[in-house]
């Protein structure tokens, strides 16, 4: 089988969770005898030295150039005789699906790597994250931002409904990370969900009440430094407020380039 992964950035496993999972999937599919290709929008020269398991190709135009990229996408599927497309960022690429449906026997799987309503639920927090000045004008601006939140959430939900409507129009399967996200998905797309599947985390571990190793008074964060999803800034802000009360503790942040 010829399998094509599509995602905006290359699958360097140190870049993030989606990239690591995709790298592992590519290797496993290849091990099982399948032919795997990857198609991206961004060519990152700083990550070209990694031994990617599958050949990487790139869209010739910006993401917003849907018609041009769509024609390229269809030609690419034909040239490489792709049987299955695994889209790791459906909200970016669903506008290309219609170009593949003129071809026979191309199966599309759209993978959602987050809660479909995750940002919607916390949009108010995002809007209010930047604290204004403690002045009359600063307080007026804060009130204005609070008043705008319902409209921002309304507009954002309509955008989600449009995006997911486009995804379901052509995809053969939509994969969630958990069946617990189905109620939120239902709020966005309330039609037939028979094509929805979920692959939850298969790893379960028993609670460890007693351990033999010595513990340090250390708070350890391991992950990429990214604001919207990881909220590392909030962790640092909290630590800034409390660290003087706990002088024998330390906060350690480890990310892909070091410590």
Residue ranges of model-derived segments:
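N-terminal subdomain of nucleotide-sugar transferases
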Residues: 1-43, 80
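Active-site proximal beta-strand in glycosyltransferases
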Residues: 3, 84, 102-146
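Short His-centered aromatic/hydrophobic patch
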Residues: 87-93, 112
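A short, active-site helix/loop in glycosyltransferases that binds the activated sugar's phosphate group
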Residues: 145-195, 205
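A structural motif in glycosyltransferase catalytic domains
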Residues: 22, 29, 219, 234-236, ...
């Amino acid at each position: 089988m010829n399998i094509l992964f599509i995602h905006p950035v290359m699958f360097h496993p140190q870049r993030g969770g989606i990239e690591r999972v995709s790298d592992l999937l590519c290797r496993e599919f290849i091990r099982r005898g399948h032919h795997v290709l990857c198609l991206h929008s961004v060519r990152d020269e700083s990550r070209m030295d990694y031994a990617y398991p599958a050949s990487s190709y790139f869209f010739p135009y910006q993401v917003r150039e849907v018609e041009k990229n769509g024609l390229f996408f269809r030609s690419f599927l034909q040239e490489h005789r792709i049987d299955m497309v695994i889209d790791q960022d459906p909200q970016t690429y669903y506008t290309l699906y219609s170009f593949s449906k003129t071809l026979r026997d191309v199966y599309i799987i759209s993978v959602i790597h987050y809660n479909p309503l995750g940002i919607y639920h916390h949009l108010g927090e995002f809007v209010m994250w930047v604290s204004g000045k403690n002045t009359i004008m600063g307080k007026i601006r804060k009130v204005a931002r609070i008043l705008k939140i319902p409209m921002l959430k309304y507009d954002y939900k309509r955008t989600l409904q449009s995006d997911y409507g486009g995804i379901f129009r052509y995809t053969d399967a939509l994969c969630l990370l958990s069946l617990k996200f189905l109620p939120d998905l239902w709020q966005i797309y309330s039609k037939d969900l028979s094509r929805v599947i979920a692959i939850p985390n298969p790893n379960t571990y028993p609670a460890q009440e007693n351990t033999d190793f010595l513990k340090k008074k250390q708070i350890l964060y391991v992950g990429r430094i990214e604001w919207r999803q990881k909220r590392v800034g909030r962790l640092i802000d909290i630590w800034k407020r409390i660290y003087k009360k706990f002088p024998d503790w330390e906060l350690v942040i480890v990310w892909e380039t070091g410590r």
